[in-house]
Amino acid sequence: LGVESDNLPGFVVITSVSKGTTCGQIFYDFYWGSGFLPSRYQGVKFRGGGSPVLYVENPDGMTAALKRGLLDDIGKINRLKYQRVQDPEIETRIAQYEMAYRMQTGVPELTDLSEEPQHVLDLYGPQVKEQGTFAYNCLMARRLIERGTRYVQVMHAGWDQHNSIS
C-alpha cells in the first residue's frame, strides 16, 4: 500500500470509547497486526481517549534537538545490529522510530479541528468534538485519508446489539 504522507502511517486503526457500553467486545492489537507479512505493514492504533498515540509529546525537559540526537544514536546502534544479523525486523524498528518522531508534527495538526468549517463538523453530528465517539473517529478517518494515510479502520464497540441480544 505504501504511504503518501511523511508524518503519518499508511495503516491506522482508530478505536472508540463507548460510555455505558458493556458489549464485551475487546479490540485486541492482533486484529490489525501484519499476520504473515513483515511487521512494517501492521496498523498503528490511535486511541479513543486522551492523546491518540501514546508518547507522541516530548516529556518535560526533552527538547526536539535532544530527542533527534537520541533517535540518531538509537538508529546507529540498530544499523550496526542489522549489519551483523541482517534481520529485516531491525530495519522495521528503525523505520518505526523515525515515523514516531515525524508523527510528533503530524498528529497534533491532524487532531486540531480549529480550521474545520462548522458546516463540515455539522455533517458528523453533535458528538463530533467528543474524542472517542464514532462521529469524531469518522472525522479523524477522513482527515487521515486526506493527509495520505492509505487505510483507516474505525473500530466501534457495541454497534451491532452484542450488548442486548437476548
Each model region followed by its residue ranges:
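Ligand-binding pockets and gating/stacking loops
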Residues: 1-166
